[in-house]
């Protein structure tokens, strides 16, 4: 999956620079990924000059269905005269009642746009997309990408599954890239031994489905393009923004005190996933 600098940070930049957002709702499901992402985004927004009173943070349990009071709070928060946007790390089936309640309370994508990190083609498949049309999602791949390699992949996938209604999505592309990288690394190493493949995979480059190249970095993150899509009535995405090139994944965020001095480099002699550049020590799971 994407590192925060390959999804969450560019999404905020888009909302800030292209949409003009000045007030921010960070809404997430109550578990580690949304909480960590929102800590990063809160710090990032404050570094951009956003004040505490212009940031609202909300967490709900998995499967949350009663969004009336929270959406009412979002609506009130967005009525202060500043352009407001929602950055959503809400996961799973809680998304459906969330977007429905936005519509019930008359909140359109033009009023308060929502950008999501867990709503893709598969999640939109098979249900009424009307409440979601115009809202946004940030991914590293969309089925609607205009690239010959993507068209060939989709044709092959639909032929294989024998169902023209099926969709492709970002996690599928990640598997596509990952398997091709593994094959290249095995070929390079001359063995399937996991340690040898781990060493060989750094620097491996394979085509992605957007017409570019994915490269495995020394920190075991790959380079990815960043795409922002607007939800359409057919459950597909109209790509409204994309990065000028591929973005290298940052294993440790520069916007958290506990990680800004940490780097990852799995090449010898360092071979460390959490190396503190100030202390010169490798810690955590690599501590010896």
Tell me what each language-model feature is.
Residues 10, 109, 223-226:
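Extracytoplasmic
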Residues 20-27, 79-84, 136-139, 159-166, ...:
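Flexible glycine/proline-enriched surface loops and loop-helix/loop-strand junctions
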Residues 26-29, 164-173, 193-197, 213-216:
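Surface-exposed patches in mature extracellular/periplasmic domains of secreted proteins
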Residues 40, 177-181:
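Short amphipathic alpha-helical face segments that pack within enzyme cores
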Residues 101-176, 186-192, 243-274, 283-284:
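Extracellular/periplasmic periplasmic-binding protein-like sensory domains
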Residues 187-207:
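Polar, surface-exposed loop/tail segments
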């Amino acid at each position: 999956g994407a590192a925060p600098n390959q999804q969450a940070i560019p999404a905020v930049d888009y909302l800030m620079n292209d949409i003009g957002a000045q007030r921010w709702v960070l809404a997430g499901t109550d578990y580690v990924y949304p909480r960590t992402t929102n800590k990063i985004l809160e710090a990032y927004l404050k570094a951009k000059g956003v004040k505490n009173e212009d940031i609202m943070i909300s967490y709900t349990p998995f499967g949350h269905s009663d969004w009336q009071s929270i959406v009412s709070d979002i609506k009130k928060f967005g009525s202060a005269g500043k352009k407001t946007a929602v950055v959503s790390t809400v996961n799973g089936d809680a998304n459906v009642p969330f977007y429905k309640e936005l519509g019930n309370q008359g909140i359109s994508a033009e009023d308060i746009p929502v950008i999501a990190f867990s709503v893709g083609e598969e999640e939109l498949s098979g249900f009424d997309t009307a409440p979601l049309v115009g809202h946004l999602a940030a991914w590293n791949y969309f089925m609607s990408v205009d690239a010959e390699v993507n068209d060939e992949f989709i044709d092959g996938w639909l032929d294989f599954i024998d169902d023209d209604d099926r969709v492709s999505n970002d996690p599928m592309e990640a598997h596509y890239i990952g398997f091709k990288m593994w094959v290249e690394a095995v070929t390079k190493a001359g063995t399937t031994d996991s340690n040898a493949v781990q060493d060989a995979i750094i620097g491996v480059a394979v085509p992605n489905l957007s017409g570019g190249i994915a490269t495995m970095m020394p920190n075991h993150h790959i380079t990815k393009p960043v795409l922002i899509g607007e939800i359409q009535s057919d459950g597909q995405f109209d790509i409204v923004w994309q990065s000028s090139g591929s973005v290298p994944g940052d294993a440790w965020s520069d916007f958290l005190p506990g990680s800004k001095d940490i780097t990852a480099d799995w090449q010898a002699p360092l071979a460390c996933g959490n190396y503190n550049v100030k202390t010169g020590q490798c810690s955590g799971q690599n501590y010896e």
